[in-house]
């Protein structure tokens, strides 16, 4: 087989492919063996019709069509591999010659990944955020623990305050008519949580247990239930019980109750270490993202529209899958958010374009620096995946190969190594109290 690639436009390549006559002959025989099993010819059992008679019955063109349906994709993908082009869409194929005893000639026109003009990606100046943890940070974390483990205690007297949990009965009306689904009994509502329509919870502040009050609210214009959007409603609310958090004092007993430590000091030290580790992780992530951002900003590339369109479709598909796992369809989500698919595409477009450019630039840097993923690194990644899913590594490998996902493992590793390369070759300043120092 022979293949020649010619760039006819900036991101368009013309492949001229020649497949030898012997391969066509084999493809024709394969086509005959496949078709003869599905076509009944008078006087012969299905699958037993001699080829010359079968060809006369169905027409030789049927065999040519079946043979080319098999031969063209095989030859095309081999040509792509041999020429090293990177297609971004399906090719437009034009058959030039197909005749038994002669080579098959066809052309394939296809858009390919654009060329990237790299800018500066070494010696990037980056600032690592401060990872200092103050005593105040630790105390805030202790307060969060106090609130998390606080007990709700029923008030014998007093009124509702922000942060309290009120047990309420409520019934809503619009123009005197009950709201469908707008009533509840013994509903537990944390005041200030934003669980109800804006203005509802605020109007419960100051109510005592046993008190009933009429409150007025207006549903937002983009409210998920369209029949209520923008309408004014009146709710009758009865507070049946008020519960308030009982905060445990910060002492050794508290430490024992909420952790594996015996003293408050040990708990403080542990929280400090965890906050420090979290801060270091955030700083490392920020440095990586800043390195990628600068390298991408410094590069130039004209992105074909089809790449952005495909990326957009992937992003929407990922969102739809995530919503589906939560029992919600994309259509319902759009309805609840008061937007359309066109609105969603428009809002996602800049991110899609940025994602494509980032991928192209990182690929270009990897090529320029000879960054690759070794077989051993791929094997190690598969072992990690297998351990996570409690599967045999070989079973995971075969599954990835079957689904054509193995190359994405290698691509992910190359991307990680490329980002690491950017950071290792950057000039990193340390941010200490808002001042960047080397």
Curated annotation (Swiss-Prot):
Residues 163-248 form the PPIase FKBP-type domain. GO terms for molecular function: peptidyl-prolyl cis-trans isomerase activity; protein folding chaperone; ribosome binding. The keyword Isomerase applies. It catalyses: [protein]-peptidylproline (omega=180) = [protein]-peptidylproline (omega=0). Its main location: cytoplasm. GO terms for cellular component: cytoplasm. The keyword Electron transport does not apply. PROSITE patterns: FKBP_PPIASE. Its EC number is 5.2.1.8. One of its GO terms (biological process) is chaperone-mediated protein folding. Signal peptide: none annotated. It is found in: Cytoplasm. Keywords: Cell cycle, Cell division, Chaperone, Cytoplasm, Isomerase, Rotamase. Pfam families: FKBP_C, Trigger_C, Trigger_N. It is an enzyme of class 5 (isomerase). NCBIfam families: tig (TIGR00115). Involved in protein export. Acts as a chaperone by maintaining the newly synthesized protein in an open conformation. Functions as a peptidyl-prolyl cis-trans isomerase. Belongs to the FKBP-type PPIase family. Tig subfamily. Consists of 3 domains; the N-terminus binds the ribosome, the middle domain has PPIase activity, while the C-terminus has intrinsic chaperone activity on its own. This is Trigger factor. It comes from Pelotomaculum thermopropionicum (strain DSM 13744 / JCM 10971 / SI). The lineage of its organism: Bacteria, Bacillati, Bacillota, Clostridia, Eubacteriales.
